Structure formats: C-alpha cells, structure tokens
Curated annotation (Swiss-Prot):
The active site is at residues 276, 351. HAMAP family: Cytosol_peptidase_M17. It comes from the Bacteria. InterPro entries: Leucine_aapep/pepB, Macro_dom-like, Peptidase_M17_C, Peptidase_M17_leu_NH2_pept, Peptidase_M17_N. GO terms for molecular function: manganese ion binding; metalloaminopeptidase activity. Keywords: Aminopeptidase, Cytoplasm, Hydrolase, Manganese, Metal-binding, Protease. Binds 2 manganese ions per subunit. One of its GO terms (biological process) is proteolysis. The gene is pepA. Mn(2+) 1 binds at residues 269, 347, 349. It catalyses: Release of an N-terminal amino acid, Xaa-|-Yaa-, in which Xaa is preferably Leu, but may be other amino acids including Pro although not Arg or Lys, and Yaa may be Pro. Amino acid amides and methyl esters are also readily hydrolyzed, but rates on arylamides are exceedingly low; Release of an N-terminal amino acid, preferentially leucine, but not glutamic or aspartic acids. Its EC number is 3.4.11.1, 3.4.11.10. This is Probable cytosol aminopeptidase.
Length: 497
C-alpha cells in the first residue's frame, strides 16, 4: 500500500472511493465548502442523500453512496467525527481506521481521504491519519492457509490524504512507528511453539544488526553468576533455555538522558504448579506483551534515531511451566539485590522475573526505568480492557508518560503506591511473599516491584488489559494490539528534544 499527500483540491480528486469526514450538527448536515463544490458537480445528489438519510455527522456513523457511472468518483463515503469540541488526534486515527476498513470491504484500489485538522498541526494530523490506516489494515494471516483470508489484502493500493499539504516526513514517521507496533502485535499473536525465549533473543539480535543497536544475551550461567535467583527460579521448570536480553540504542552525538525499558517476557505462562484452568490458560502466549512492546519500541527508535538519548531494552525471557523441577509453593528465592522471596503462588511469576531485570537496569546508572508487564488480572478488574495502570515513585516521570499517552490515544490511569498494603506481603520466613491478599492485587504487585528499585525514578505499567482485544476496536484488530509502543516512542522522543 502506498500512502501519499497531493495538492489536488478535494472536488477535483478522482478514484474509486473518496471519504469525507464531517463534524456533528444539531439537525441534518448542511454541506459547506469545499464540499458544496463537489455537490454542485453531482447536481445536488450528495445533499439530497444526506437529507434522506438524516445524516448528522455523529461519531461512529457513516453514509456510503455509489455515484453515476460517468463520474470520476465511483463511490463517496461520509463519516461522522462527532462533536467538534471532542476532536483530537485519536479521533482522526479512529476515523481513518473506519474509512480504511470500508475501502477494503468495497475493494477500492484508490482511496482519497479528506479529513479536517482544525487547530492541530497538519503534520501531526497526517501522522495520526496514516497510523489509523496502517494499523487498521494490518492483517496477521501468517498461519492461515485458506486463500479466502488473503483475497482482500491488496485493497486499497493507494491512499491519498487531501488538504494537508506536503507531508512526506509525517507519513514516513507514521510507517516507522507502525512497523514497531506491528512487530509487537505479531510477536504476541504467534503461538508459544513459534515465539520462545530463543525467538525473542534472536529477534533482538536481528534488530541490532539491522538498525545499528547493540545486543547482549545472557545465558542461564551468566544470570546465575549475577545472582538472578528470582528469574532462574521461574525458568527452572522449562525445557527451553531462558534468555536475558539487553538491547541498547545510543544516539549519535552527546547523550543527555539514559533510560531503561523493562518488558515482562513470559512466552508462555501455565501458572506453574498453581496451574491455570481452562478459560485462563489458552491466551497465555500473550504474557510476553511487555517484551513485545519493548522490542517494537527498539525497532522504531532504530529507524527514527532520536538524538540525545540512550535507551536500554531489557527482557528476562522464559516460560513458566510444570515439571519435576518446577518451583513449589513455599520455596524461597534470592533475587540479585540479595532480598529473599517466599513463593506463595507460582502463578505470580512475572514479578519474579521483573525483580532481577529491575535490579540489572538500575545498575546501568540510568535516569529513569519504565517496566511494562501483563502483570495482574486485578488491573483488568479495576480499569477494564482499554486502560493500563500506571504506578510511579516520581511525579515528573508519571506526568510525562501521561502526556505522551494522551497524544497517542493509549490510555493510562495512575494508581497509588499505598505502602501500608505491603505489610500484608511480609513473610514469616523470608523478606517478602510474592503475592498479597486478594484485595488490591495490582497495587501489591506494584509494591513488590518497588522493592527492587532503590533510588531511580521508576514507573510500572500494568498492560494486562489493553495489550489484547477479542474484537475489532478502532484501529486495533482482534488479538495483539501492540500497546503501548506508540506512547513509549512519543515519550522517548520528547526527551531528545
């Protein structure tokens, strides 16, 4: 698919499908320029159809019409943007996704899109529209053999953005960002017999070779030498070797900020001896969603090459399996900072792997650490499927992440680090247990992770809900969403300016 901007006036564009987005009105929509010119060329047909359908431009509504055979446009699509006061970049992304999916269903080879940008910068609008199109049209059919699954993939061939001026740089940036999102999606979508800890390590090495990053892979023995007892305790039941992945992006020139991103990398989570049951185990290939997003972000930075920053991408990759070597409930592990952990639930394993990864990250002397993990079902209970939980020991870091998420439409909600709740995680035989009581489960998980960060500004993102969707939603398709690659890229690039 080719994305482009052209100076052609909206009424002069010709092709298979022209999509026009309009704001909501109190009554039936009355066309204004430049659409009145188009309506005049159609002898008033457009306004007539709007009146018949009582189209008001409400969000989520659309009106598709086939035009006269001799007209240079084959079809015209009106899409509602909703209230003008609610208009933002995310509205553009979601509207663009609706248009792109319609073009594919209608088998339109050429698609013209006329979307307003109001007070938004034209470059930002072009990037948001392009992101919506690319992500909506991404279809992961790698494991399908039926040709029917691929018959619509060629559509549309060319997408033209109208009324935004020349925006080649914005479209290129959108494609590069979406490349990272799609990598994250496809890592999450692939089954655990395809994406293993070895696969994640190989992916990191490929990214390093392609984009000029540096990759360091620690094997089981290396991790043992560093005292990573928590990570290796989880890994000991699997027949597959664990891989501790350290990928680094260093910008050209002077580095002003050093950041570590730590992603949970459980390529399959059976729950261990606290075995998951039917209804909870089938989708546990997605338990490496944090690692997938970290690698997706690395891919984007390798292409954008923002100045002034050094970013460390860290993943403790393993499976959580059952075998004669598996962790028992009640076992005590020693993390690499010397703290001891009584494992009272083997299905709370992600925090154990993250514990050693956080200690490792802090020893790098970074200015901030952000970990992201499909950590708790409790966070989904609290915030639902579309919002991630955010915990931080640093207000400035939390605000910066929130600002980036607002621009990208990937929602976070800040949650409290209520230290009193950690009292319930204290162990009679070790420094702490790995889980607390049933209540406030996402908060106690964050408090557990905080024990492995001494002084560095740190944020924890529990992405268990939004990393996966069962249904089409905006520009997200069923399965992995690639959340929150775009937010991380936005935040990291803001540090380089």
């Amino acid at each position: 698919m080719q994305l482009q901007t052209v100076p052609t006036a909206i009424p002069d564009w010709s092709g298979d499908l022209l999509a026009i987005a309009v704001f909501q009105t109190e009554g039936t929509l009355t066309l204004t320029d430049p659409y009145t010119t188009l309506d005049q060329r159609l002898n008033g047909l457009l306004q007539e159809l709007i009146n018949e359908g009582e189209f008001q431009g409400k969000s989520g509504t659309s009106l598709l019409m086939r035009l006269l055979p001799n007209f240079p446009l084959k079809k015209l699509l009106l899409v509602g943007l909703g209230n003008r006061e609610d208009f933002n970049l995310e509205a553009l992304r979601r509207t663009a996704a609706t248009i792109a999916r319609t073009a594919r269903r209608e088998r339109a080879k050429t698609l013209g899109m006329a979307l307003p940008h109001e007070t938004l910068e034209a470059a930002d609008a072009a990037q948001a529209i392009a992101e919506g199109v690319i992500l909506a049209l991404h279809s992961d059919v790698r494991f399908k053999t039926d040709p029917e699954a691929r018959k619509l993939l060629p559509y549309p061939e060319v997408v033209t953005l109208l009324g935004l001026g020349e925006q080649t740089a914005a479209l290129t940036r959108a494609q590069q960002i979406c490349d990272g999102v799609i990598l994250a999606r496809e890592l999450v979508n692939a089954p655990a017999n395809e994406v293993t800890p070895v696969t994640l390590a190989e992916t990191a090495q490929q990214l390093a070779a392609t984009y000029g990053l540096t990759a360091k892979i620690l094997e089981r023995e290396d991790c043992g030498a560093l005292g990573m007892g928590a990570f290796l305790g989880v890994a000991q039941a699997s027949d597959l070797p664990p891989k501790f992945i350290h990928l680094t992006y260093t910008s050209p020139g002077t580095v002003h900020r050093k950041i570590a991103l730590v992603g949970k990398g459980l390529t399959f989570d059976s729950g261990g001896l606290n075995l998951k049951t039917q209804g909870g185990i089938e989708t546990m290939k997605m338990d490496m969603g944090g690692a997938a997003a970290v690698l997706g972000t690395a891919k984007v930075l390798g292409q954008l090459k923002p100045p002034g920053i050094e970013v460390h991408f860290i993943i403790a990759a393993t499976e959580n399996m059952i075998s004669g070597r598996a962790l028992h409930p009640g076992d005590i592990l020693t993390a690499s900072n010397g703290k001891t952990i009584e494992v009272n639930n083997t299905d709370a394993e992600g925090r154990l792997t993250l514990a050693d990864a956080l200690v490792y990250a802090e020893k790098l002397g970074v200015d901030a650490i952000v970990d992201l993990a499909t950590l708790t079902g409790a966070c989904i209970v609290a915030l639902g499927d579309n919002i991630a939980g955010l915990w931080s020991n640093n207000a400035e870091l939390a605000q910066a992440l929130q600002k980036a998420s607002d621009r990208c439409g990937e929602k976070f909600w800040q949650m409290p680090l209520e230290n009193k709740y950690f009292e319930a995680m204290k162990s009679q035989v070790a420094d702490m247990k790995n889980t607390g009581p049933r209540s406030a489960g996402s908060i106690t998980a964050a408090l557990f992770l905080q024990q492995f960060v001494d002084h560095t500004p740190w944020a924890h993102l529990d992405i268990a809900g939004p990393v996966w969707t069962e249904k089409e939603d905006g520009y997200n398709n069923p399965c992995g969403t690639g959340y929150p690659v775009r937010t991380l890229v936005e935040w990291l690039c803001s540090l380089s300016s």
